[in-house]
Every structure is written in C-alpha cells, then in structure tokens.
C-alpha cells in the first residue's frame, strides 16, 4: 500500500520488499504487446512523470492484460502504479541490450495529479555487482555509476544501473563488489 500524501511505500508481501516502485504520471503511448506467460499477455506502455525541475521522465511500464483493458485508448489518463523495477537482456543482432521497466502489480486511475505528491520513488535492496565508476561531468558534478543486482523469486535477479550524485557519489565510489547496498531514489529516462 502507498500513502501518496506522505510519499511512503508499504508492501505487505515480504517477497517484494527488496524492490519497490511507485509512479504517478500520465499515459503517453498505446499498449504494445511484449510477451505471454501461461496464457497471460503482458504489454508495454509509457508514462510521463514530472520532475521538480518540470523536466519529464518517460518511464516504460510492463502491465498484465488482467489489470487493464489494453485495447482501450488510455493516452492522457493519469495513473498511479506500484510494482518492481525489472531488467532483462534483449538480444539484438550482435549485442545484448539491457531493457528496464516497471513491472506493475497494482494500479489506480487518478482524476488529476497532485503536485504535492512524490510522483516517482524507488527502493532497491541488493548487491553491488561491478566496480563503481566515479567521475566528474563536464560541468564539474560528481557522479558514480553502480550496477545493483536485486534478487527476486525463482532464483532470478534484476540488474539495475544506478547513478549517485555529489557526496553520495564519493561515498558510493568506495563500495566493494558483492557488498550489500540499499538505495532510495527515482527512476530517470534513458537517453
């Protein structure tokens, strides 16, 4: 459950405590078929989420046809979702591409988006799986690139790239491969 006013995520299912996402935004694309598992179809749809800077992040959602009518035009609808941030490797010609999306577990349609609500939150509890890369941007901002492995059921893991800024970047640059980390933040669009 999510307390939107307070911006806190509460999930009763213990299995999902190590990977929690809540997003509030506007649907900006049609549903695209992704795959089917045991007769259940899964579809991709994009949601625009506003940052405090008024820049929009476009976040892909993976959603079951059992949660929403994928044949209906939902573009322009405001939606609140909770779920997990998932990854998989898509094999493209001669290389693999890491595909990231929010796997939707629950959703709610909203009449309007309250600007006071924290509209984009993620919590990950996992393990650093490669050496952090610390660097400075051309504008002098400190950042550290991390790759976090987050375990899920059936022996699977999601590999989530993360960026830390400022003093958090300096702190994260000292993380050891295999070390346990907990991260709170937001999901940003990939360029």
Regions found by a protein language model. Give the residues of each.
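OB-fold and OB-like single-stranded nucleic-acid-recognition modules
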Residues: 2-191
